[in-house]
Regions:
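Short, solvent-exposed loop/turn elements at domain surfaces
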Residues: 69-75, 129
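Hydrophobic membrane-insertion alpha-helices, especially the h-region
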Residues: 21-42
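N-terminal Lys/Arg-rich, disordered targeting/topogenic segments
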Residues: 1-19
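Ser/Thr/Pro/Gly-rich low-complexity linker/stalk segments immediately outside membranes or between
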Residues: 40-59
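Membrane-embedded segments
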Residues: 105, 114, 120, 124-134
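Alpha-helical scaffolding within the catalytic cores
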Residues: 46-51, 103-104, 128-132, 156-169, ...
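C-terminal domain-boundary segment and adjacent tail
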Residues: 2-3, 79-111, 240, 250-260
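Metal-dependent polysaccharide deacetylase catalytic core of the NodB/CE4 family, i.e.
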Residues: 66-69, 115-117, 137-266
Length: 266
């Protein structure tokens, strides 16, 4: 005879098993959609040397998007609007350049195409890769996907994982960059000048309608109190920053085998 406790435990275990199976099924669907979205039939072709006109070399423009989804919920851009942007750029004769092109331009004076475009997407979102790759391939553009390696270990399907980032690079239409190890805000005040201190990205997003412009990226300043007085010494700040840069390097090397050459703070 089964006791009430045993029956309850068995019922609870069955529910847990169903939940695990459902979660695994969702992950499989997400992975399938992602890899189908990355299916490309061509390879990126660098711009032709004839695109370079020494007399018209005026550097390049950099265009960065926070992210892309199907409908364009703020702060993301929609798939259709991105298609309009890229089509307009292509019509005006813009060709994309790579991170190496930029480095050679500044360090060796290598000329760039008359209409050179550096294209980047921030935050390392999975939906960005899904909804933008086909458009990038369509116009033979090359883009950089910037990520936060702190997200590699999180069980959050919103962000790209190392294996997926490698798949992006394999398409030849993507390069990798970084926005830093993580995103965090310090010395935050709301628009009424109330001191809030330090905020995570989630906390920041939840109260963003009530925030002004008084805040700092956590790598850009001392952590300060409401009077602007540092709450840490120079040595403490340096140790905090050193730890962050070391974690960035370690996680990228472990996840994708190397550290991206492009670093952009949001």
């Amino acid at each position: 005879m089964i006791s009430a406790d045993e029956e309850y435990t068995a019922k609870k275990n069955r529910k847990k098993q169903k939940r695990v199976i459902l979660q695994m099924a969702i992950l499989v669907v997400i992975a399938t959609v992602f890899y189908l979205a990355l299916f490309t039939v061509g390879k990126y072709k660098p711009y032709e040397p004839t695109a370079i006109n020494m007399a018209q070399d005026k550097g390049f423009i950099a265009l960065s998007y926070f992210g892309v989804d199907r409908v364009g919920q703020q702060p993301l851009i929609s798939e259709d609007r991105l298609a309009e942007h890229l089509a307009a750029l292509r019509k005006q004769g813009y060709v994309t350049i790579t991170q190496k092109d930029i480095k050679d331009f500044y360090e060796a004076g290598k000329p760039l195409p008359a209409r050179a475009l550096f294209l980047m997407f921030e935050d390392g979102r999975r939906d960005t890769a899904i909804f933008s790759t086909s458009q990038i391939e369509k116009y033979n553009y090359k883009a950089t996907m910037a990520t936060y390696p702190e997200n590699f270990a999180k069980r959050d399907t919103k962000f790209l994982k190392p294996r997926e980032l490698k798949s992006l690079v394999d398409t030849s239409f993507w390069e990798l960059g970084t926005n830093g190890y993580r995103l965090s805000f310090i010395n935050v005040f709301d628009r009424y000048n109330n001191y809030l201190g330090e905020l995570t990205p989630l906390e920041y997003a939840m109260i963003s309608p009530y925030l002004g412009r008084r805040y700092n990226h956590y790598l850009m300043d001392y952590i300060r109190d409401e009077h602007g007085v540092p709450k840490e010494s120079y040595e403490m700040m340096k140790a905090r920053l050193d730890y962050d840069y070391q974690k960035l390097s370690d996680d990228y090397r472990e996840g994708i085998g190397s550290v991206p050459q492009l670093y952009v703070l949001m």
